[in-house]
Regions:
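Core beta-strand elements of the Rossmann-like FAD/NAD(P) dinucleotide-binding domain
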Residues: 29-31, 187-200, 204, 343
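A conserved short coil-to-beta-strand element within the FAD-binding core of flavoproteins
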Residues: 160-177, 316
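Active-site-adjacent segment of FAD-dependent monooxygenases/related oxidoreductases
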Residues: 68-151, 155, 159, 168-171, ...
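Glycine-rich FAD pyrophosphate-binding loop
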Residues: 47-73
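Extreme N-terminal leader/targeting segments of oxidoreductases
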Residues: 1-33, 48-55, 174, 341-342
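Conserved FAD-binding catalytic core of PHBH/FMO-like flavoproteins
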Residues: 147, 151, 186-188, 200-319
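Conserved mid-domain beta->alpha element of the FAD-binding
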Residues: 30, 38-47, 145, 203, ...
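Short hydrophobic core segments
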Residues: 34-36, 137, 195-206, 352
Length: 566
């Protein structure tokens, strides 16, 4: 017999430890959480909630099946760190293109109409993250999330051909939200209207979100009146940096961003096209893929571009829009994680439903997954009775503020990208020095990597009053992983990679010597671990406590360590 898990269990180790419930093709009448939309935000929330058999979760989507061809492809360092918690980061890294360096090209002062390389830098500065910035199709990321959910105790899968119609709220009911869903038959002919009662609803249904409209929120913002095209191509070219992420500013033909795709063949090109008149829509331009190819050739001169195949292309307008809140709290309610604010919040929006960005900075999918990662565990903690419902108010407080920062960055980045480069012939105030643009790109590296996020004080986040006790771990920021050696088996690993999306709270003790831990661990075990751990459960079932010690691991005697650390 072949053993797969723990040396004695003949089963797939990727499957849930608890008995797996079969997926039910019909929609239930009552659920704890109803997720509307199976994009990056919806799947991230679903992946987190799929770990808990005691939480009933349903995902609906009006599409007829999973995403086949994804528009987004850039995966920030922080997102890859997040994938560790779901167990598929290694698969992403194996399949993806790694963005190691970025090259910058500017107009050639010696030859009019030509471009020349002006710089080449690291895409991610050393020490920022143990994970790289990578490129992989959004559809493939969806595949990993879907597999993770299927392997969980709920066997969770989206219900496709199911469209959200409307909802109503009755706070006196055990399931306060009544949601109407239109279900299409598999042949696409017949429809059936069904009612689902839910405790919480999360709208992850994109920029035209019907959930957002149902709670009276709207996206606010503007456009830059600039058309851009994007295409994934198989091409022959003598451009020397075709397998590097490359930023090109030509003198008069516009700008372009080149991003190699996974697999070693395709290349994605973002191509600046025409200016739009105020109020003009890009659809009126009747742009074609041939127009995109011709523009790319002009920008890349003197280098040649022979496109053999276009696997996907699209055109878009640069625009940034933001919703003022990401939940259905009433006006005037505080959003700092207070009890009063949460009592008004049962419906949430995430991803493009709450914010839209231009694609070139590669933030859209990453921020959407970050929204889901932020909200998913909070819903689980509340529904499992581990936290007060007031923590749910921190979601909008934290993520809306971050989205506002991203939009400000995206607006500046898009403006600089579309500006004509300063040359000997062009010195007007609206132009940008290529060297200044490169410096700006480098300066914003932490931001685009997703590791500069710092949440403000709230119910969950301290005010930094004791920050001096651990200056290397900033209160409100993500836990920066570091290499360690596990004492028990001398295995070298990353500390942050030991924390899975399993709903447990983490308590890390940083100590100089093992002898310093005895009294503290005894106190924490009595007043914290035993207090919150259900009778009969493992001592780390709710709070996972670990110690990080200095010095040689060989000098540590396991027999002398506190039992709660073993």
């Amino acid at each position: 017999m072949q053993y797969y898990l723990n040396g004695f269990t003949p089963r797939n180790p990727n499957l849930a430890k608890s008995p797996t419930l079969p997926h039910r093709p019909e929609l239930p009448t009552h659920v704890d959480v109803l997720i509307i939309g199976s994009g990056p935000a919806g799947l991230t929330i679903g992946a987190q909630l799929s770990a808990f058999s005691e939480i009933s979760t349903v995902i609906i989507d009006q599409k007829n099946g999973p995403l086949q061809v994804g528009q987004a492809d850039g995966i920030a360092c922080r997102s890859v760190e997040m994938f560790v918690a779901f167990g598929f980061s290694e698969r992403v890294l194996k399949e993806a293109y790694w963005v190691n360096e970025v090259s910058f090209w500017k107009p050639d002062d010696a030859v009019q109409g030509h471009i020349v390389r002006s710089g080449r830098i690291l895409d991610v500065e050393d020490g920022l993250s143990e994970m790289p910035h990578v490129i992989l199709s959004q559809a493939r990321i969806h595949d990993f999330f879907l597999e993770h959910m299927r392997n969980g105790p709920l066997s969770l899968e989206p219900h496709y051909n199911s469209r959200f119609v409307n909802l109503a709220r009755d706070d006196s009911a055990d399931y306060p939200l009544r949601v109407m869903v239109e279900c299409r038959s598999s042949d696409g002919v017949g429809t059936d209207l069904k009612t689902i009662r839910a405790r919480y609803v999360v709208g992850c249904d994109g920029a035209r979100s019907t959930v957002r409209k149902a709670i009276g929120r709207r996206l606010k913002g503007d456009t830059a009146n600039q058309a851009w095209g994007v295409m994934d191509v198989l091409a022959n070219t003598d451009f020397p940096d075709i397998r590097l992420k490359s930023v090109i500013h030509s003198a008069k033909e516009g700008s372009m961003l080149i991003i190699p795709r996974e697999g070693g063949y395709l290349v994605r090109m973002y191509i600046e096209l025409d200016k739009l008149d105020p109020g003009e829509r890009i659809g009126n331009k009747h742009l074609t893929q041939d127009r995109l190819i011709a523009a790319a050739r002009r920008i890349m001169a003197p280098y040649t571009l022979s496109v053999k195949e276009v696997s996907w292309w699209s055109v878009y307008e640069i625009g940034q829009r933001l919703c003022d809140r990401f939940d259905d709290s009433k006006p005037g309610a505080k959003n700092h994680g207070t009890e009063d604010a949460e009592q008004n919040a049962r419906i949430f929006i995430a991803g493009d439903a709450g914010h839209t960005l231009s694609p070139k900075a590669g933030q859209g999918m990453n921020v959407s997954m970050g929204d889901g990662f932020n909200l998913g565990w909070k819903l689980a903690a509340v529904l499992r009775g581990q936290a007060k419902p007031s923590i749910l108010a921190t979601y909008s407080h934290e993520r809306q503020a971050l989205a506002r920062e991203l939009i400000d960055f995206d607006r500046d980045f898009a403006k600089m990208f579309s500006a004509r480069p300063k040359t000997q012939e062009n010195t007007d105030d609206n132009s940008v020095d290529p060297a200044v643009f490169q410096q700006y790109f480098q300066k914003q590296g932490r931001f685009t990597a997703g590791v500069s996020v710092r949440y403000p004080p709230s119910t969950l986040t301290g005010d930094g009053k004791h920050q001096k006790l651990a200056e290397g771990i900033t209160v409100g920021m993500r836990f920066h992983s570091a290499p360690v050696i596990r004492v028990a088996d001398a295995r070298r690993l990353h500390l942050g990679h030991q924390f899975l999306a399993d709903g447990r709270w983490r308590l890390l003790l940083f100590a100089g010597r093992a002898a310093d831990l005895g009294a503290l661990c005894e106190y924490l075990t009595i007043h914290l671990l035993r207090r919150f751990t259900p009778t009969g459960a493992d001592i780390d079932a709710v709070i996972d406590m670990r110690a990080i010690l200095q010095g040689s691991y060989r000098s540590i005697d396991l027999a002398r360590l506190p039992p709660s650390l073993l």
